[in-house]
Design a protein with these regions (language model features):
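Short beta-strand elements
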Residues: 29, 168-172, 233-241
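A hydrophobic, small-residue-rich beta->alpha segment in the mid-to-C-terminal subdomain
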Residues: 239-277
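Iron-sulfur cluster-binding cysteine motifs and their immediate structural context
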Residues: 188-207, 213, 217-233
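Small-residue-enriched alpha-helical segments and adjacent helix-cap loops
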Residues: 9-15, 37-184, 188, 192, ...
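Flexible, glycine/charged-enriched surface loops at secondary-structure junctions
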Residues: 65-72, 103-105, 142-148, 200-201, ...
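C-terminal, charged low-complexity interaction regions
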Residues: 293-315
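Intrinsically disordered, low-complexity polar/charged tails and linkers
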Residues: 1-36
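A glycine-rich phosphate-binding loop feature that marks nucleotide/adenosyl-phosphate handling sites
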Residues: 150-157, 283-294
Length: 315
């Protein structure tokens, strides 16, 4: 059995008020030192240019310990920045269009998979996540929420970026649409389906809707053009990971345009600010008000019409 040693790490020499202030800027205390901090450098959606990567490396060498780590939300953490270097470090990053962030009860940095480039990707994940970053991470940066609010964009139902473990998750969809006249009953669709959601019956393609995750593989496998698809976005709400775990609940509505999805993201943020209680996660808010009720509100324009009122109210 081990005994806790309160003196295991150096005592911090930075005042508590300053620790709290810089934490709000994206600098977290490094417990290994008396006065150093680790900074989360926001990537936007997990993608960086070579120039920006070089800039982060240069900043790590010039103002910090030279150590760089990657966060679970695809940001870059520069470690071991002395307190007195924080201002200069931030100014250096700004020259390259980079900034610290990713802390506090607000919209957190957006996570995206590589769906734009991936062979399984069904939507432009880079493009959509970048729009969400500018509209809602940056656009809502000064809006205080009841708790952190995480957003993830996944290109397909493989869910590599785990969208349904975020407060709002977006998943690319290809919903198969069959043309029975063209179907020759070859079974190529059946062989490629990873979830056994289709079969050939009386020589024709049949899809089991409740099992299909709309990954689009059957559409690609059909060599006679008997399968077209409806392009869309599945949205999940209320996912979370950590001490308490919850998978996001998929809305019944399939969204068919980026504009619809972007509007829904804003509505979800406004719903959380309007009906959330300080200290509770979005999953708790949804459990309290009911997911069916939440979906009804989100599919209307009520929240957008009340946007100024909601943003002005005190939490």
């Amino acid at each position: 059995m081990l005994q806790y040693d309160p003196n295991r790490y150096p005592k911090c020499t930075v005042p508590a008020a300053e620790i709290a202030r810089v934490k709000g800027l994206g600098f977290l205390r490094d417990k290994r030192t008396a006065d150093c901090f680790n900074c989360r450098v926001v990537t936007g959606n997990g993608k960086l240019s070579a120039e920006k990567l070089h800039a982060i490396a240069d900043a790590a060498k010039q103002f910090a310990s030279g150590e760089v780590a990657l966060t679970s939300r695809m940001n870059v953490e520069v470690q071991g920045i002395p307190f007195e270097n924080i201002e200069a470090f931030t100014a250096f990053l700004a020259e390259y269009g980079l900034e610290p962030g990713g802390t506090g009860p607000r919209v957190r940095p957006v996570v995206s998979c590589k769906g734009t480039a991936c062979v399984f990707g069904l939507i432009d994940t880079y493009g959509l996540s970048e729009k969400i970053h500018y509209l809602y991470y940056k656009g809502y940066h000064n809006v205080k929420l009841p708790h952190k609010f995480k957003i993830a964009v996944g290109g397909c139902p493989n869910n590599c970026v785990k969208p349904d473990l975020n407060d709002i998750g977006i998943i690319g969809q290809w919903v198969p649409v069959a043309n029975a006249e063209k179907c020759v009953g070859c079974g190529a669709c059946v062989k490629t389906c990873p979830v056994d959601a289709c079969h050939v019956e009386e020589g024709k393609y049949v899809r089991t809707t409740k099992d299909c995750n709309s990954c689009g593989r059957c559409v690609r496998a059909c060599h006679v053009g008997a399968l077209a698809y409806e392009h869309g976005y599945r949205v999940t709400l209320g996912g979370r990971w950590g001490k308490k775990v919850a998978r996001g609940i998929a809305l019944s509505h399939l969204f068919t345009s980026e504009e619809e999805v972007l509007a829904l993201v804003e509505k979800a943020i406004l719903l959380f600010r309007d009906q959330g209680v300080a200290g509770e996660r979005f999953a708790d808010t949804l459990a309290r008000i009911g997911i069916e009720n939440a979906e009804q509100i989100l599919l209307s324009d009520e929240l957008l019409n009340r946007k100024e009122e909601i943003l002005a109210k005190a939490l």
